[in-house]
């Protein structure tokens, strides 16, 4: 079976610019699907993958990944006629009713998020490809599939965290016997990934691009200075979920699109926002350190709760949010898991691969494989200080 997985939501940013003129350029990037890519999977094996941005001389792009698709086909020595399915790593169809509440949302769904919008792009760039061979896979399921099917394991806990999928900010799956069973979803209004990205934006960086800068700044800051703010802002619940009242603040449709109320609250209760180009001061490093500490607290809370609930001792992390060395270190120290696997493609490029792997798994078994990214095992000696030694790692060939 030959499947091309794709990611990206063409026209999302252009739609926002037309619907809400006058925003800051950085505010238009509070959007999904800006990492278009393609991956070719044949009989459950990844053959080739590529980012669309590489072909249009951009850092990131949301445009339909036709150049990446053509590259994948060329590298495999096949044509589009040989492809059994195209799988997209977003599926907004179940939430169509949510976009019928106002005219702008309805138009956003029609022009950007709907199946018909995707089919129009396929027809434009791949004329003649049958629409019945085009499928959608929910975003977090695509992320989970990418991680689970490349882990080499038959059974594990899968935790997906990013700013948001279709409506989720964090999802937990039980992977067993080649199937992904969703056991918990947390909505974007309580997304720790979304809060992390908004704090990065507040400190003068790009949303969904520069979060790594926040993580780097955190190493120089003192988290205690703003710890109380984040302890109040992010509530850990007994059922393994979290609640973030800050993200539930809403005003107009326009304000909701750019998280305006939450950002005003950050400005009033945390620190005055830093504009790009302004000096980075100690106070900004302290904010970053407190946000990082909060993020780690949430990921550990979720992972540990569902480890106890399921009894699973292996965990896979997927999505853009958990790709941090600090998070991995805290999970190792927690001793809730014997081994941790980090998805080698945590961003939306991984969702393209995951969509293809998931669609393949519905009709045939995915071949077992050793992972192509490090396996991080738990510290073998109880009481041994993990700061004094490197983790054991195993690499695939």
Segments the model singles out, each with a brief description of its role:
Residues 1-397:
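Short acidic/glycine-rich loops and adjacent helix/strand connectors
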């Amino acid at each position: 079976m030959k499947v091309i997985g794709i990611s990206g939501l063409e026209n999302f940013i252009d739609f926002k610019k037309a619907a809400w003129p006058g925003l800051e350029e950085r505010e238009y990037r509070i959007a999904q699907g800006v990492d278009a890519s393609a991956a070719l999977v044949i009989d459950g094996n990844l053959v080739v993958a590529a980012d669309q941005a590489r072909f249009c001389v951009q850092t990131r792009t949301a445009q339909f990944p036709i150049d990446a698709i053509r590259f994948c086909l060329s590298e495999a020595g096949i044509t589009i006629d040989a492809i059994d399915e195209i799988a997209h790593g977003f599926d907004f169809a179940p939430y169509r009713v949510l976009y019928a509440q106002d005219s702008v949302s309805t138009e956003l769904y029609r022009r950007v998020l709907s199946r018909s919008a995707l089919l129009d792009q396929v027809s434009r760039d791949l004329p003649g490809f049958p629409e019945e061979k085009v499928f959608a896979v929910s975003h977090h399921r695509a992320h989970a599939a990418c991680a689970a099917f490349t882990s080499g394991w038959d059974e594990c806990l899968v935790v997906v965290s990013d700013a948001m999928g279709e409506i989720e900010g964090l999802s937990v799956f039980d992977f067993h016997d080649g199937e992904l069973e969703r056991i918990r979803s947390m909505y974007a209004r309580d997304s720790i990934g979304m809060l992390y990205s908004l704090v990065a934006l507040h400190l003068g960086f790009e949303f969904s691009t520069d979060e790594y800068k926040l993580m780097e700044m955190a190493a120089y800051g003192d988290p205690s200075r703003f710890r109380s703010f984040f302890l109040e802002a992010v509530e850990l619940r007994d059922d393994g979920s979290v609640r973030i009242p800050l993200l539930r603040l809403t005003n107009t449709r326009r304000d909701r699109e750019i998280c305006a109320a939450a950002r005003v609250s950050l400005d009033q209760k945390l620190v005055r926002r830093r504009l790009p180009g302004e000096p980075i001061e100690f106070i900004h490093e302290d904010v970053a350190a407190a946000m990082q500490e909060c993020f780690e607290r949430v990921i550990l809370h979720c992972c540990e709760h569902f480890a106890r609930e399921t009894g699973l001792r292996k965990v896979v992390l997927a999505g853009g949010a958990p790709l941090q060395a600090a998070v991995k270190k805290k999970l190792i120290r927690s001793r809730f898991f014997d081994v941790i696997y980090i998805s080698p493609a945590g961003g939306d490029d991984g969702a393209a691969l995951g969509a293809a792997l998931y669609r393949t798994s519905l009709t045939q078994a995915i071949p077992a494989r050793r992972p192509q990214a490090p396996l991080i095992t738990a510290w073998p000696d109880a009481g041994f200080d993990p700061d004094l030694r490197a983790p054991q790692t195993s690499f695939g060939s």
